Amino acid sequence: MTKENEIRLAKLENEAGTLDLKLAKLDQFLFEHKYKYDINPEEIRLMKAQRTIMFSYSTVLHERIEVLRKEINKPRINADDVMLNS
């Protein structure tokens, strides 16, 4: 189970990294075009909505990563240890 969790963790970290990079690029684009009028205001509004959704998803991904890390690092109780302590 631990190996499966480590694989899941790696996939989540990869997805979160990719999403964070896209967020940074979108933020940079929005910042650069904040006062330029070469883009339709409706497009800017939609990009800001997209950014909000992406940020929410990124937050959820990072929370899932932390939960999975804790699960992977949680000490395991061995059945033999339980029998010895009884």
Task: Identify the meaning behind each predicted range.
Residues M1-S86:
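Extended, charge-rich alpha-helical interface modules
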